[in-house]
Each structure stands twice: as C-alpha cells, then as structure tokens.
UniProtKB/Swiss-Prot annotation:
Cited Pfam families: peroxidase
Alphabetized CDD domains for the sequence: catalase_peroxidase_2
Name of the protein in question: Catalase-peroxidase
Binding site for heme b: 262
Catalytic activity as recorded in UniProt: H2O2 + AH2 = A + 2 H2O; 2 H2O2 = O2 + 2 H2O
Known cofactor(s): heme b
Crosslink site: Tryptophyl-tyrosyl-methioninium (Trp-Tyr) (with M-247): 100-221
GO CC term, one of those recorded: cytosol
Signal peptide start and end residues: 1-23
GO-annotated molecular function: catalase activity; heme binding; metal ion binding
Organism: Francisella philomiragia subsp. philomiragia (strain ATCC 25017 / CCUG 19701 / FSC 153 / O#319-036)
Length: 739
C-alpha cells in the first residue's frame, strides 16, 4: 500500500549524496579518482547555524526548568487541536511514533541516523512515506519549543515527547538524557540502493545490504504489509530481524519494542484506494508554499480525524490505545487472524473470533467500536521461532515485558548519543549498558607533569621505535566515529577483542608494542605510593606523542604535543565484540591500508569518509596524510607514498616531491592500483604510490592545500599543523574533558 501511495502521488524520491555510498562498493562508480567529493569535510552545519559561533547548548540547557517542561508536555497531550485532532483525545501515541521514527533511523554500520541532531526536521526524512503526518506532530510541539527557546534543542524535545507520553500512559521509562544538539540542514546520508522511494529493495537474495538498516528507501525499518508490500509472514520475520539487528537490536529487544509500541494508538488508512491520487497531496518537500512546510494535504472528507490518511493500514491493536496493557500479546495469541484489506487497499489482518472485550474504540466517535488489527509484521512475532520465544515469554510475564520494553526504548532513543559522559539532565539512569561502550571511572590520582616527563623518558628508553608508537596510537584513536560518538582512544580497546585481532592493526606487531607499554605501566604504578596511576589508554596516546616529537626532532624541529591524562582501560566484559566490529574500516588512507574490497579508484573517497568520521577538515586531512607518509607508518611497512629520502622524520617531503615536475607518474604494469613515479630525464623509478597519495596532486582543492605545505618557509608550519591535527585525533571521544 505504501508503494501504491508513493506511485499515485508521483514521489520520485531524493538524489543520494556520494559520501556514505562508499559502504557498498557496487553502488557507486567513480570514473576517476580525481572526482573525489570533499563535501563531507565541510562543516556547513556549523556555518549555517543561526545560533552564533559562541552558542553552547550545554550552557544554555542550564537555564531550563525540566520539571516545568515536562508538565507542559503532559498538558499538551490532551489539548486536542482543531487543525489536527488527537486520536482518542490524546497525542501520546502520535508522539511515541514521532520519537521512534526519529531515533529509528540509526544504523550500526556507519553510525548515521538516529535522533541526535534532529534530522527528521529536514528533507529527505521529513518527507519519507514512513513519516507521513509527523510534520503535524512537530508542529504541535512548536509552542513548547517557542516557549523554552534555545534552552532545549529540537532533537531533545522530539525524543522527550515520546518518553513523556509513555509515562503519561502508564509505561514508566527508566530515564531520559538531554544533550542532543541540532543540525541546521539535511545531511547527505545514503539511505538506500535506489533513490526512488519504496521502488526497490535494499534486500537482495534475502539479505539486507550491509550499508543499510531499512529494507527500502523511505522506510524506518520494514514494510508493515510484508516484504515489498506482500503479506508474507515468514519473509517479514526475516526482514524484521535483519533491519533491527542492523540498528543494534537483539531479537528480545525487537519483540519488546514492536509489541510495546503497538500497545498504543492506531494506524490510518481511511481514504479509498481509488481516491488517493485525487485527494492526497505531496509530501512536505514538494508541497505548495502556502502549506508552510506541512505535507500530505488530505481533501477526503474532513482530511483529519476519522478521515486521516497515513500508511494506508487502518485500525488499532488494543482496547485501551492510550494506556499500557497486555492486550497486544493477548490478542496475538488468542484471536484467529485472517488477511483482509483496509479501506485504502492495504494488506492487514483482522480476527474471525473477536469478542466484545476485544473490540477497540473509535478514535473520534464515542461508543463506536471496531475489530482490532494486526500487521503482517506483527504476526511474524508469533510465527517466527526466534521471535515466538520472546512473545511467549512476555505474554506469560507481563512485568518482564514492561521492564524489557523500558530498557529497549531507552536504548532506541539514546543509542546514537555515544558514551554516558555525553548525557546531561536530571533523569539519567544510574544503570550502565554495554551498548554505551562504558569505560571505568578512574579511582586513582592522575599523573602530574613530572610523572608525564618520566613516562615519556621510559617510553624513549623502551626500545620501541617511533613508527611502532605512532601506528599503535593512531590505530587506537582513529576508530572514532563522529556520527555516533563511538570509538577513540579512551578505553584502550585496541588491547581487547575484536580490535586487537583486526588485520589493519597488524596483530603480531601490535602485541609487541602493547606488551612493552603494559610493562612500563606496571612498573610505574607499582612504584607510586601516592595513589597515582597511569592507564594503558593514556600510555598508548603518550607513546604516539613521543614518537611524533622524536621524529620532528630528528628532522630539526622542536615540538611538544599537549597530553591530557584521564583515559581509563575498559574490560573485555564491557566490550560488545559484535558491535565493535562495525568500527572496523575497509580502508584507512592515512596509513595506506585497504582490505581489498574497494576498487583502487574508490580509495580516495574512502579516505574522505574516514577523515569525516574523525571530524577533520580538508587541511587537517591533508597535513595528516603528508606527515604520516613522511613518518613511514604505512600498513605492512609499504613504501607507497613515502616520498622522502629520510623516512621516519617529520617533514614536508611528501608534498615537495609529489609536486615535483621532474617526476612523471604512470600506472604500474604489474601491481593493480599502484602508480610508479619515474624520473623524466633518466627513466629511473623514484617512487611508488596509491590513488590516495596522488589525489593530493590531482584534485584541485587538495592540490591547493598541498602546495601551501610544499612552499619554502612553511616547513615549521607543516610540523606545527601536523602536531595540532594529531592532537585533535588523539582527543576524539574525550567527552570527560573540555579543552
């Protein structure tokens, strides 16, 4: 039915941006490496923000009266508006859907999506078929946002709306954290294999494409009618499991969320199928200007209330759609379900043996009753063996069901916020969860400046090379993802599974470095009697700093990279191996690593994607690549891109030699993806390179930056800029401190 609506309305979908399409090698073809898209490295949201460069949400939040805000939200739930009447006189179910669909776009593969940043306010998400009419939900929240202003973000308010709604309807949440900051424009996430809304599936041969979480462009998870709109219960179960797992949910959490969410509210499909094209207007992004950002104008009947058109499915699941109960599971197991069609022609299921106590109230006409409904996806929770295990368990244990839903809801709405140290507000639960990537709180005294000096000397005397120290620190810190604030150096998870075993980290070499650093750590901690300790996480970063400083010294430059102690060491029990494997990248151009899954001409774009995840801009990415090549820290000791006669010294030789016209570049005849630098006069081979190396002389913007670092007189600038960018990467994920 959703596809029919999209087809009828002529919604052709959105063009996709290139940056995140790197995740699927078969999806994006670049004719040449120089066509690299640098837009992910431009922080346009910050430039476009109307809040000003000095605005600090955390500071502004301090003036928020959270209890007053909550009271206003509770009052709003039952203040039905004539322009969009509340079903059952309560906006609670509507706001739960708003929050869920905002947070539910999160995906583990690259950390994109989720409620943080409030992307649902912008195209394309605001116009997805699955988000039909949520423009009205956000409009209902506007008076509250207007009242509290910049003390509360849109992204926090949207999630809070659903959480307060749950509590008001008898489902007490385990807590809520503020701290989400708003974007000011739609991002360029690649949401599907095809740009056409609901026109093709992200599922091929029964498998969801690894880059995605929703099964089709324009959906949050799956089509409720079944795969591609077909009422196939078994197929629906498979797609549900894959989609929810791609968002980080277990089978138990998936069942709790679906069964709990469908305890509330109703779905809307009042418009007859034959009238949809005539009566339903376009989504917000294509709506007439006089509608002021509201879409899906409905000319059928009153266009609202009982005449509302949403997904096309029509009805409620339970007899008390504005109060938490056990009816969904009771109906699932005690009623016999037959396939029917909604007034809009959508596939749904109604019972053949409904009793008076099973009937559900009409959303707007007192005394009128209807049969309950189920989606094809709802029945999958009963028919699939894996899901059935938990629906039975919850059916027999209502209190467990309530508790598991509360935990799953908190995870759904907070998963993309990163570690708990980013949470603010009075309602943060004390409990820690493994999906928060917890790290221990330091119960010891941090190292002093004198201690740091001693440890640096211990590292210098350890016998570890600069290259070993630099690579280990880089591999530890560069796991960070700005999208969901995961990874980074804090926790020293490079010493734990799965990171210690990743090919890109060269496990055998890594083990040698970690053993030596642990020895230094043990000796230092055992010799301190004043309660001072140093973590392995801090030592890894300090070791990298030492390596860079020593390499600069060998090149004739004196630098001191700032070091901020306070990192702690996570345990294996605090580390979800499956979840952390999503932080493993296919390519890291900073060390010329590739796992072989990407074509050579896609490696420059993969570098940009990596740099974007590290929150770097174009000059920072450029100086880091040039410095890392000079430092000779490539994966597997490769010499590709090491354009220097003094490998291991921190200097600007990479840029000087890259831009030297005495060198002519040709593709290698023997090694695919490799380029040979040949002396124009003698014909002798001078260098070897990858497409990542040569992009800095090929792409006009990157070449402009490279030329700055190759200029006479800018040698010290290069070293200083490298040190600054290096420190930035080492500090990623340090939400426990503010520099």
């Amino acid at each position: 039915m959703l596809k029919k609506i999209v087809t009828a309305l002529g919604m052709s979908g959105m063009l996709l941006a290139a940056n995140s399409a790197i995740a699927d090698d078969k999806n994006t073809e670049m004719a040449t490496p120089q066509s690299v898209d640098l837009s992910p490295l431009r922080n346009l949201n910050k430039l476009d923000s109307p809040m000003g460069k000095n605005y600090d949400y955390h500071q502004s939040f301090k003036k928020l009266n959270t209890e007053e805000l909550k009271k206003d939200m509770q009052d709003l739930l039952t203040q039905s508006q004539d322009w969009w009447p509340a079903d059952f006189g309560n906006y609670g179910p509507f706001f739960i859907r708003l929050s869920w669909h905002d947070a539910g776009t999160y995906r583990l593969a690259d950390g994109r999506g989720g409620a943080n940043r409030g992307q649902q306010r912008f195209s394309p998400l605001n116009s997805w078929p699955d988000n039909v009419n949520l423009d009205k939900a956000r409009q209902l929240l506007w008076p509250i946002k207007q009242k509290y202003g910049d003390a509360v973000s849109w992204s926090d308010l949207i999630v809070l709306a659903g959480t307060v709604s749950l509590e008001s309807m008898g489902m007490k949440p385990i807590g809520f954290a503020f701290g989400r900051e708003d974007d000011w424009q739609g991002d360029d996430t690649n949401w599907g294999i095809s740009p056409e809304q609901l026109m093709s599936s992200n599922v091929k041969d029964g498998k969801l494409a690894p880059a995605y979480a929703a099964t089709q462009m324009g959906l949050i998870y799956v089509n409720p009618e079944g795969p591609d709109g077909k009422p196939d219960i078994k197929g629906a179960a498979s797609e549900i499991r894959q989609a929810f797992r791609a968002m980080g949910m277990t089978d138990k959490e998936t069942v709790a969320l679906i069964a709990g969410g469908h305890t509330f509210g109703k779905t809307h499909g009042a418009v007859p199928e034959k009238d949809i094209k005539k009566d339903i207007g376009p989504a917000p992004d294509k709506a007439p200007i006089e509608q002021q950002g509201l879409g899906w104008h409905n000319s059928y009947g009153t266009g609202m209330g009982d005449d509302t058109m949403g997904s096309g499915l029509e009805g409620s699941w339970t007899s008390t759609p504005t109060f938490w109960n056990h009816d969904f599971l009771h109906n699932l197991y005690n009623l016999n379900w037959e396939k029917t069609l909604s007034p809009s022609g959508a596939h749904q299921w109604t019972p053949t043996n409904a009793k008076p106590e099973n009937m559900v109230p009409d959303a707007h006409k007192p005394g009128v009753k209807h049969k309950p409904i189920m989606f094809t996806t709802d029945l999958a929770l009963k028919e699939d063996d894996g899901f059935n295990k938990y629906t039975q368990e919850f059916y027999n244990n209502p209190q467990e069901f309530k508790e598991e839903f509360a935990k799953a809801w908190f995870k759904l709405t907070h998963r993309d916020m990163g570690p708990k140290s980013r949470y603010i507000g009075p309602w943060i639960p004390e409990q820690n969860f493994i999906w928060q990537d917890p790290v221990p709180v330091a119960d010891y005294k941090q190292v002093s400046a004198q201690d740091i000096a001693q440890l640096k000397q211990d590292i210098i005397n350890s016998g570890l090379t600069n290259q070993q120290l630099i690579r280990t620190a880089w591999d530890s810190a560069s796991t960070y993802r700005k999208t969901d604030y995961r990874g980074g150096s804090n926790g020293a998870r490079i010493a734990l599974a799965p990171e210690k075993d990743w090919q890109m980290n060269e496990p055998a070499k890594l083990e040698v470095v970690l053993a030596k650093l642990k020895e230094i750590q043990t000796n230092f901690n055992n010799n301190k009697t004043d309660g001072t300790k140093v973590s392995l996480a801090d030592l890894i970063v300090l070791g990298g700093n030492v390596g860079v400083e020593q390499a600069a010294k060998e090149a004739g430059y004196t630098i001191e990279i700032p070091f901020v102690p306070g990192r702690t060491d996570a345990t294996q029990a605090q580390t979800d191996i499956e979840s952390f494997n999503y932080l493993k990248t296919k390519a890291d151009g900073f060390v010329n690593y590739s796992d072989g899954s990407l074509a050579s001409n896609k490696l420059p774009q993969a570098l940009v994607e990596k740099a974007s995840m590290l929150n770097l801009n174009i000059p920072e990415m450029t100086v880091l690549v040039g410095g890392m090549r000079a430092l000779n820290v490539n994966y597997d000791d490769s010499q590709e891109g090491v354009f220097t006669k003094t490998p291991g010294q921190l200097n600007n030789n990479f840029f000087v030699n890259l831009l030297d016209m005495s060198t002519k570049w040709e593709k290698s005849d023997t090694n695919s993806g490799e380029y040979i630098g040949i002396d124009r006069k003698t014909g002798a081979q001078k260098w070897t390179a990858t497409s990542v190396d040569l992009i800095f002389g090929s792409n006009s913007e990157l070449k402009a930056v490279a030329q700055v670092y190759a200029e006479n007189g800018n040698e010290q600038k290069f070293v200083n800029d490298f040190a600054k960018a290096w420190h930035k990467v080492m500090m990623l994920g340090r939400f426990d401190v503010q520099e």
